[in-house]
Every structure is written in structure tokens, then in C-alpha cells.
Amino acid sequence: MLTSIRHNYRLSAIITPTTAAQADTLNAGPSFGDFVAPDAPLSPAEAYEIKTVQVGPEGRKKTITRLPEWLKTPIPSNANYKKIKKDLRGLNLHTVCEEAKCPNISDCWGGSDKSAATATIMLGGDTCTRGCRFCSVKTSKAPPPLDPHEPENTAEALSRWGLGYVVLTIVDRDDLADGGARHAMETIMKIKQKAPSMLVEALVGDYAGDAEMVKLVANSGLDVFAHNVETTEALTPYVRDRRANFKQSLNVLRIAKETKPELITKTSIMLGLGETEDELWKALKDLRANDVDVVTFGQYMRPTKKHMAVHEYVTPDVFEMWRQRALDMGFLYCASGPLVRSSYKAGEAFIENVIKKRRMGRGGQVGGAQIAEMEKSA
């Protein structure tokens, strides 16, 4: 009898009726459908409509915004996705895809063949010394020491996957005298030793403005030097860590280009942070003045409630407008869309084509017809 009473007590403790406030909270949270694209395409009017829902107890309800339809993505699956994840765990490697909660992980990791799959390896560990208000990567003033095996393990993993184009993201390491530049250089050199034909893009920090460290990475053998300005100059103090500034980022990109002119230089800007049209125009002009080749635009998506709020969800039409404006200004390539991120597969395919054509001696600049042709293949 005592056993029965205890059993019933446990059940009653577990099966507790949901209160109205709890039900509201659950109903307003992400549903299964929030992460899965709908089967039937919506009309533009339906797709672009921002939906809201009221949550909270009576008398204290508040309105929150639902995720727009154009930001919904498939759940990660497929054999390539599982293989990449297994290899990463086995070699104790990290990816920005996971750490930054990228919405494109199912698309990039789940490519139908090896050449289509992409994973962005994060070097320097999984902890950054900067605390930008948009970023979900862990942060600390004193992160763990660098893993001396990371360069070799990274090169080994990438050689297993047989990819044609890889992306490395290096966390800021202000705790190190060289900012982690030599670690990045060693990794790139080992990748090129194991796979000479593999194209390497490295997304690096600003190395606190140290030009010698920028030159070190630029001369390491990489093909694409990426450094993100992230937002407009006016918003930089509110969005990025206080040690970062817009002009310093421009200098990093300029120094890399001057060090090795054949390098493709690349940067990314988030939209939806409250930037104005004039601020964006100025940012693009400044980037072109510093000979930046590639720019990408993507929607800022708030990782957690601790991060800065989304000011607006920018529609696909506006992203397309900025893509065309960037191309008209002379950028070699522009990927622009709500789900575009700095490491974006279609952009990588395009850049890969450009580098191969340059290696074959077909000229450094790409005309409008070539751009259209290569965008189709990407």
C-alpha cells in the first residue's frame, strides 16, 4: 500500500496541470514548424507578413514577433551532416556553424556530395576574448591555451572530406601576443601541404590593428582574406566589442590587399540592426575605397535574450536591392539574403570559379556576363 501511495505521489508531482501563463509562454515559443520550411510556397504577401502573438497573464500581456517565413530552415540531417559532425568530435575541432548557431548548417553540412558540403572550422578554440553584442560564441578574458595539435587535426579533417573550398574562422585572442596569427598561419600552411589544390578562406579578427600580424596571415598561402566590419560605422560602438572600430577594420582589409594584391578580400554586413540607407551607402563606398572585392549581406538574428534585439526583419526584396547596388559599385561579388552568412556556400562556389580562372591566366576582373554565368553554376 505504501509503495502504491509513493507511486501515485510521484505521478501527481510529475503530471502538474499547465497554468494559463505557462500555456501562453509555450504557445508563443518556437514550434516544430518554426524550424521547418512549409511544403507549399507562400504568396509574397503571406511570406513577407510579420506575424505577432500576445503572451503573458491577463492585464499584463505583451506582443512578440514571430519568425518570418523566409527565415525558416530545414532540420539538419543526412549522411554528410553526420559524417562531418563525427569527424569534428573525433578530432576535437570546433565550427562556427555550431558555435554561432548558423541557420544554414543543414544546407552547408548536408551537401549532396563532398564537393558541395561546407563546414567552417573555428580555430583558436571555442572561446573568444571579445564580447560583441550580436555573437553567441563563448567569451572570456582568459580562454584556454591554444591546442598545439589543432593545425594538424584541422588539415587532417579537411583532407578526409575532400572539399575543394574550405573556410577557417579564427576567434579573437587578445590574450596572446600575436593574437593567434601564427597559429592561423601554421594551420593554413598544413592544409596546403596536405591538399595543395584546396582553396582556403580565412575569416580573421583585427589583431588589435597590428599590421605585421595581418601581413603574416596574408602571406600564409590562403586564397581569400576575410574580415567582417559587421555593421555601419555609426552602429559599430553599439554592436561590436569596444576594442573594435570601423576604420581599424578597413585598415586590416587594406593591408591584406596591399601585402598580396592577388588575394580576394571579403567582408560581411548584418542588416536589421537599425542601420540607415545613408549609413549603408557610406559603408560600401569606404569598402570599395579600400579595394575590398566581396561583400555579403545577411539578416541579424538574435541568438539569446542576452544579445541585442532585432530592430527589423529585412525583406528579401531589400536584400536583392543592396546586392545589385554593390555590384553596380564594382564589387567582384555580392551574396545578399536573409539567411546569407559570411561563410556562404553559393558565394564560395563563385569565388572558387574566379580563383580558378585567374590561375588559368584569364584575367583578374570578371565581367557582367561571367558574373551571371558563374552565379548560375553556384
From Swiss-Prot:
Enumerate the cofactors the protein uses: [4Fe-4S] cluster
Gene Ontology biological process: lipoate biosynthetic process
Identify the EC number(s): 2.8.1.8
Q: Which CDD domains match?
A: Radical_SAM (cd01335)
One of the record's GO molecular function terms: 4 iron, 4 sulfur cluster binding
Gene3D superfamilies noted in UniProt: Aldolase class I
The broad enzyme category this protein falls into is transferase
| NCBIfam families, per database record | lipA, PRK05481.1, PRK12928.1
* Protein name as it appears in the record: Lipoyl synthase, mitochondrial
